Amino acid sequence: MRVDLFDFDLPEESIALRPAEPRDHARLLRVRPGQPFEDRQVFELPDLLQPGDALVFNDTKVIPAQLEGMRERDGNISQVSATLHMRTGPDRWKAFLRPGKRVKEGDRIRFGHSGSSCFLGTLDATVAEKGDAGEALLVFDLSGAMLDEAIASVGHIPLPPYIASKRAEDERDRKDYQTVYAREEGAVAAPTAGLHFTPDLLEKIKAKGVEEHFVTLHVGAGTFLPVKADDTTDHKMHSEIGYVSQRTADALNAVHERGGKIICVGTTSLRLIESAAGEDGIIRPWAGATDIFITPGYKFRAVDLLMTNFHLPRSTLFMLVSAFSGFETMHAAYEHAISNGYRFYSYGDASLLERADKAKDTA
């Protein structure tokens, strides 16, 4: 499909720069294809679910993966920014470098505070390989837990570009840009639909008889990359590492066997569950990379509902929700959201989407 079909006008003031307080007081737009939109709030979510349903959360934890450093070559020094997006070994990460053209294979980069003599104040790396679109493989002088500690010391939370262009990252973001259930370190970006959940809301969901299950997809910086192709068939998704345990797969399959629904919290959970599901709809264990790219025409295998934030024009995530609930339905839903003051993007409001083909089946 043509990428420009997924374009729409989004006023700058619609982009949220801070999350709602409390988290679960963000607005929630309920979208059921063929029915009127419902304006709700996230704390009402238990009222929209049924006992026996299951919520699927992504428990990845955001690391401070934005590094600022200096590259020295032949006496010339230039500033380099790196956004780590995939760990490939104890001492190496794939990263997006800016400006990528200034960096060559073999270059040495020193990240952090150049005046410090302590390894926690600086972090050195070698550019081992260069790829496309500013991507490079960095091999660090530290590895394992020592590398993790150094990244935590010198790194910054990599706020999405549309927020970072408006304000600097601050200490508050280290809490705001993390779900309350995050536990598996490795993400560059938060699974933002999960940011709306509070411990109190999770308890109310359990009390309703709704199951909670966790998967892990380490969200990479590729989620921020714009779609530069004119047609969706020419866009290549960056892969991300994910895990679905045997126990979780069995539990979710049992939900369907009992007639319950699987509700993914966030597009990351959905992409992982759909990667792990076969054409028969059975979810199987998963451990590895996925680069699944969901656009209209995709036949969903396992996920019944999706809770997700409001996404940017021409983004792969708006393409995904258009595939899930219908192209025309989602354009209308976003028009409703914009005209009614919903807040967009990572710190914005949420939507609860029903699958278009499920809506037809139950109409």
UniProtKB/Swiss-Prot annotation:
<dbReference type="InterPro" id="IPR036100">
    <property type="entry name" value="QueA_sf"/>
</dbReference>
<dbReference type="Pfam" id="PF02547">
    <property type="entry name" value="Queuosine_synth"/>
</dbReference>
<dbReference type="InterPro" id="IPR042119">
    <property type="entry name" value="QueA_dom2"/>
</dbReference>
<dbReference type="GO" id="GO:0051075">
    <property type="term" value="F:S-adenosylmethionine:tRNA ribosyltransferase-isomerase activity"/>
</dbReference>
<dbReference type="InterPro" id="IPR042118">
    <property type="entry name" value="QueA_dom1"/>
</dbReference>
<comment type="pathway">
    <text>tRNA modification; tRNA-queuosine biosynthesis.</text>
</comment>
<keyword id="KW-0949">S-adenosyl-L-methionine</keyword>
<keyword id="KW-0808">Transferase</keyword>
<keyword id="KW-0963">Cytoplasm</keyword>
<keyword id="KW-0671">Queuosine biosynthesis</keyword>
<dbReference type="GO" id="GO:0008616">
    <property type="term" value="P:queuosine biosynthetic process"/>
</dbReference>
<dbReference type="InterPro" id="IPR003699">
    <property type="entry name" value="QueA"/>
</dbReference>
<dbReference type="GO" id="GO:0002099">
    <property type="term" value="P:tRNA wobble guanine modification"/>
</dbReference>
<protein>
    <recommendedName>
        <fullName>S-adenosylmethionine:tRNA ribosyltransferase-isomerase</fullName>
        <ecNumber>2.4.99.17</ecNumber>
    </recommendedName>
</protein>
<comment type="function">
    <text>Transfers and isomerizes the ribose moiety from AdoMet to the 7-aminomethyl group of 7-deazaguanine (preQ1-tRNA) to give epoxyqueuosine (oQ-tRNA).</text>
</comment>
<comment type="similarity">
    <text>Belongs to the QueA family.</text>
</comment>
<comment type="subunit">
    <text>Monomer.</text>
</comment>
<dbReference type="GO" id="GO:0005737">
    <property type="term" value="C:cytoplasm"/>
</dbReference>
